[in-house]
Amino acid sequence: MAYRIHGPRKTVLFVPDIDRWDAPSVGPEFIESLFDGVDVAYVDATFYDGREIPGRNLLMIPHPAMIDSMELFAEHVKRKPGSIRFIHLNHTNPALHNPSVIEEVEGRGFLIARPEERTKL
């Protein structure tokens, strides 16, 4: 599920819950078009890499890993650093509380959305 919200000055993409980026209905062209013309994107990042939920197969949980999303969107954030902000982080996700993980995420050009963050449209 994704919503594109257009305002007079900015466009926001809101992807609060997605099963996977490599689903048959989602291809590279679709993903690129999804972000085309978007100023800020808020993207599902429930789990970081799956290690935070030992004993569970991340492939069986319908959420893309944050590290996979960062790899997929690496070229986009090179062009527009800070334009993708991660939301919907599970309480076990180290990007919520581990400074070195947060630094890695931000160093790759992504941000973790702040509570009550707003984007003026």
Describe the residue ranges of each PLM region.
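Cap/insert and terminal regions of metallo-dependent hydrolase folds
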Residues: 9-11, 19-118
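Active-site beta-strand termini and strand-to-loop segments that position acidic
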Residues: 4-8
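Short Fe-S-cluster ligation motifs
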Residues: 121
